[in-house]
Each structure stands twice: as structure tokens, then as C-alpha cells.
Swiss-Prot record:
<feature type="transmembrane region" description="Helical">
    <location>
        <begin position="340"/>
        <end position="360"/>
    </location>
</feature>
<keyword id="KW-1133">Transmembrane helix</keyword>
<feature type="transmembrane region" description="Helical">
    <location>
        <begin position="119"/>
        <end position="139"/>
    </location>
</feature>
<comment type="function">
    <text>Probably involved in the polymerization of enterobacterial common antigen (ECA) trisaccharide repeat units.</text>
</comment>
<dbReference type="GO" id="GO:0009246">
    <property type="term" value="P:enterobacterial common antigen biosynthetic process"/>
</dbReference>
<feature type="transmembrane region" description="Helical">
    <location>
        <begin position="3"/>
        <end position="23"/>
    </location>
</feature>
<comment type="subunit">
    <text>Probably part of a complex composed of WzxE, WzyE and WzzE.</text>
</comment>
<comment type="similarity">
    <text>Belongs to the WzyE family.</text>
</comment>
<feature type="transmembrane region" description="Helical">
    <location>
        <begin position="154"/>
        <end position="174"/>
    </location>
</feature>
<feature type="transmembrane region" description="Helical">
    <location>
        <begin position="206"/>
        <end position="226"/>
    </location>
</feature>
<keyword id="KW-1003">Cell membrane</keyword>
<dbReference type="InterPro" id="IPR010691">
    <property type="entry name" value="WzyE"/>
</dbReference>
<feature type="transmembrane region" description="Helical">
    <location>
        <begin position="37"/>
        <end position="57"/>
    </location>
</feature>
<feature type="transmembrane region" description="Helical">
    <location>
        <begin position="227"/>
        <end position="247"/>
    </location>
</feature>
<keyword id="KW-0997">Cell inner membrane</keyword>
<feature type="transmembrane region" description="Helical">
    <location>
        <begin position="377"/>
        <end position="397"/>
    </location>
</feature>
<feature type="transmembrane region" description="Helical">
    <location>
        <begin position="65"/>
        <end position="85"/>
    </location>
</feature>
Length: 459
């Protein structure tokens, strides 16, 4: 990359960055937080944060990068995608109705407590089962890629670890005080560190817990935007340190700075992967919607499907194995836009932008229902569901549409099952006479009025 080429790229990058930041800041001033703001920040992190890191690697360490044409196309495609997404998100699909609608479901105190206990139990039990089968993998494996090898059993259990976070979100939203906010951080980060040691280097739970803590603080006004930026910088350094431990790297001096640049870029902003995919566009045999279907394979146990393929050809694996002919054992993320290109070429980019806009709009709709809900138990469930799905949005931006669809469906099923089981448990305990109502003014308050009713758990 010459200085002239860098100058041209920088102009495009700066225009794109100002465009997205302006729209995001306007939204922030209007509502302070919604999932459009979160997705926009996540999008900036994924597709734009890595550009200065790439430039430092090129000019400071003479690193070979993707051809400039591909980098330019990646920046232009990313900006066009966001523009279409924003229009799709802002388009009103129906007129707002002032007529109250019948609630789909209601919640009471006991049902809500059962729900978060079930969610937490799912996470704790599966971590225990994984540990019993494998021990502390962080101290047993020689390299991170061994996590995906046949010597590690019960890999599917890792999908359940995340449910500890929505469980703690329910606890917080039941009584959103600063004390519970801090408890959320301590409990989820501690659990994330446990999973990091048990699994052997998976940092997702720690990152998500810290990010949720920050965004809840922004929503409540407990931290400022500058505090968020400072905490983000601390988080980046923390993730770099964990990456060094994960890959067993011992670096210092200029080598440490070089390692910091490329690990931070690959962790937070794999935008060069998208450029690399565009550079190999002629090698892509468009997969259609098959990667979405294939990504569900990992949720099907082998005893139920004896002939299940060991290697799932989703968009990330297709990009790694078929396009790049890379069989190192680690999948290279194609990013959100890259997964669309794998499925249907550049024509899928505007279609995907429209669909993503509608998805984020749906999450914001549920979030608003939770904020406006007068039943605080139902409000806690709705808001915990939305904030709990933030991990899936990170997967959407970083990994792609296929990974997002399978994970969000899985998340909804497990969350919904815990909700249904909690209601069944409440019905069983109530039928057995183990739950009774409080008395208010010489009369029993009806269970159907959850705002005025408090259930005592054990009689």
C-alpha cells in the first residue's frame, strides 16, 4: 500500500465514519439507548475500528495486506449496507395504535424467580458436565485450536453456558438499583472467568458481561459517554491479555505492540476478512440459504442423527476451507456482509441490509414493550430477553447471518422453555397448596392482578 493509496482509502473511510457516527449520535441524543444504537456501535467496531490498526501494521511493520482495491470495495460495501439498513430500520410498517391489546402472557413473582433460577441452572449444570468430561482445558491443551478437536468431548454443551447472563439480567431488572448493577457485573464476570478456564480460552462470556454492564449504566445514566470510551479501552487491553494467555504468547517490546495490533484487529474488527473474501470473489460458488440450515446441525445430538457431518459447512467454514483452502483448524469469520456474499453474491447485500433492519426493529419493539409494561415481573422478563440477545447481535455482525439465525432460534427456544417450565412449576406448587396469597384489606388479592399481588413462595 502506497501513501497515495492510503490517502484515497482514508478519505473514503473518513466520510463513511462521519456518516455512521452522525446518525448514531442523533439517535443517542433522542433516546439514549436502543438496539439500533447498539448495533450501530457494533457495526462501527466490526467494519471500521480495524482500519487504523491495519494501516499501522502496514506502515510500522511492513505487513502484507489484502490488495487496496478489495479494501476500498469493502469500505464502500460496508457504508452502503449501513445506509440501506438505516432506511429499513426507520421505515414505519404500520400506524401506531392507541387501543390497548390483550397481553400474550403475564408473570408473577414466583414464576419470575423460577425463570431466572432455571436459566442459571442450565448454565451451571452444563458447565459442571463439561468440566467432569474434560477438566480445566486452559491448563491441559497445548494450543487453542485443540478446543475443536476430537479429544474434547461435550462441545455442544458450550452453547448453554451463556444462559447465566440472562438469568442475572432478570435479577437486575426486578430491582434495577446500582447495587444489583454491580452484582450483575461481579457475578457474570466471575462466571465468565470460570468458563474461560474450563473451556480453554473462550472469552465471549466475559466480553458480553462487561458490555452489558456498560450499556445498562448508559441507559440508567450511571456512566457517561466518556466513561464508556475509557472502559472500552480498558476492555480492549484486558481482551488482549486474555488472548496472550489463550495462545500462550510471551512477547515484549516492538513484538508486543505488533501482536497487540493484529490480535485486537482480528478480535474486534475482522474487516480485512471481508476484503479478503471480495478479493477471492471469483472462487465463490454461491451457497444460497444452505449455510443457515447447516448451522443448525451442531444442535442435533449424534445419537439422534448417527450420520451427522462432523464438519458443518456454514459460511465461515466455507470461506475458510473452500475459498481460502485453509485447513488449520480455526474458522475465519467472513463477517455479516461476507456471509451474505457467500450465500448470494453482492445482490444479497441490500436484501440482507433490509432484513437486518427489520430484525433490530423487532428487538427494539420488544424492548419498548418491556419499558412500558406496568407489571414489573413481566417487564423484567422482556428486558432480560432483549439484553440477553445482545450476544446474538454480536454474532450477527462478526460471524454472519447463518450463525445468528441458529443461535437466536436456540436462545428463544431455551428461554421460552424455561418460561413455560416456570409457569408449570408455579401451577403445581399452587395446586399442592404450597403457594398462598398475601391479604390486602381483609380480602385475598387475585393472582390475575400481578401488580397488586405478591405470592409467598413456601407456605
Amino acid at each position: 500500500m502506497t501513501l497515495t493509496q492510503f490517502g484515497g482509502l482514508f478519505v473514503v473511510y473518513l466520510i463513511s465514519l462521519v456518516f455512521i457516527l452522525t446518525l448514531t449520535y442523533q439517535e443517542f441524543r433522542r433516546v439514549r439507548f436502543n438496539f439500533n444504537i447498539f448495533f450501530s456501535l457494533l457495526y462501527l467496531l466490526t467494519f471500521y475500528f480495524g482500519f487504523p490498526l491495519t494501516c499501522l501494521l502496514v506502515f510500522q511493520f511492513d505487513v502484507e495486506v489484502v490488495p487496496v482495491d478489495a479494501l476500498l470495495h469493502a469500505l464502500l460495501a460496508s457504508t452502503c449496507f449501513y445506509g440501506i439498513y438505516y432506511v429499513s430500520y426507520k421505515t414505519r410498517l404500520r400506524k401506531p395504535s392507541m387501543q390497548p391489546k390483550a397481553p400474550v402472557f403475564t408473570m408473577n413473582r414466583v414464576e419470575t424467580n423460577f425463570t431466572w433460577l432455571l436459566l442459571a441452572s442450565v448454565a451451571v449444570v452444563t458447565v459442571g458436565l463439561f468440566f467432569m468430561q474434560n477438566g480445566f482445558l486452559l491448563f491441559k491443551l497445548q494450543s487453542y485450536s485443540q478446543i475443536f478437536s476430537s479429544q474434547v468431548s461435550g462441545v455442544a454443551l458450550k452453547r448453554f453456558f451463556y444462559f447465566f447472563i440472562p438469568a442475572m439480567l432478570v435479577v437486575y431488572f426486578l430491582k434495577p438499583t446500582q447495587l444489583r448493577w454491580l452484582f450483575f457485573l461481579i457475578s457474570t464476570v466471575a462466571f465468565g472467568i470460570l468458563t474461560y478456564v474450563v473451556v480453554g480460552g473462550t472469552r465471549a462470556n466475559i466480553i458480553i458481561a462487561f458490555a452489558l454492564f456498560l450499556f445498562i449504566g448508559i441507559v440508567r445514566g450511571w456512566i457517561t459517554l466518556w466513561m464508556l470510551v475509557t472502559a472500552g479501552a480498558i476492555g480492549i487491553v484486558g481482551m488482549f491479555w486474555l488472548a496472550l494467555k489463550r495462545y500462550s504468547l510471551d512477547v515484549s517490546g516492538a513484538e508486543a505492540f505488533y501482536t497487540f495490533l493484529y490480535l485486537t484487529r482480528d478480535t474486534f474488527s475482522p474487516w480485512e476478512n471481508f476484503a479478503l473474501l471480495l478479493n477471492n470473489y471469483d472462487k465463490i460458488d454461491f451457497q444460497g440459504l444452505a449455510p443457515i440450515i447447516r448451522d443448525f446441525y451442531v444442535f442435533i445430538p449424534s445419537w439422534l442423527w448417527p450420520g451427522r457431518p462432523d464438519a458443518v459447512l456454514n459460511s465461515a467454514n466455507y470461506f475458510t476451507w473452500e475459498v481460502l483452502d485453509n485447513h488449520s483448524g480455526l474458522a475465519i469469520s467472513p463477517t455479516l456482509i461476507g456471509s451474505l456474499v457467500v450465500m448470494g453474491g453482492v445482490l444479497f447485500i441490500p436484501v440482507g441490509a433490509i432484513v437486518v433492519g427489520l430484525i433490530i426493529k423487532w428487538f427494539d419493539w420488544i424492548y419498548e414493550l418491556g419499558k412500558q409494561e406496568t407489571n414489573r415481573y413481566k417487564a423484567a422478563i422482556l428486558q432480560a430477553f432483549c439484553f440477553g440477545a445482545i450476544f446474538n447481535m454480536i454474532v450477527l455482525a462478526r460471524e454472519g447471518v447463518d450463525s445468528f439465525v441458529s443461535r437466536v432460534v436456540f436462545f428463544c427456544i431455551i428461554f421460552g422453555l424455561c418460561l413455560v417450565i416456570a409457569k408449570l412449576l408455579y401451577w403445581l406448587f399452587e395446586s399442592a397448596g404450597l403457594i398462598r396469597m398475601y391479604l390486602t384489606g381483609n380480602r385475598v388479592v387475585s393472582q390475575k392482578c400481578p401488580l397488586q399481588c405478591e405470592e409467598r413462595k413456601w407456605s
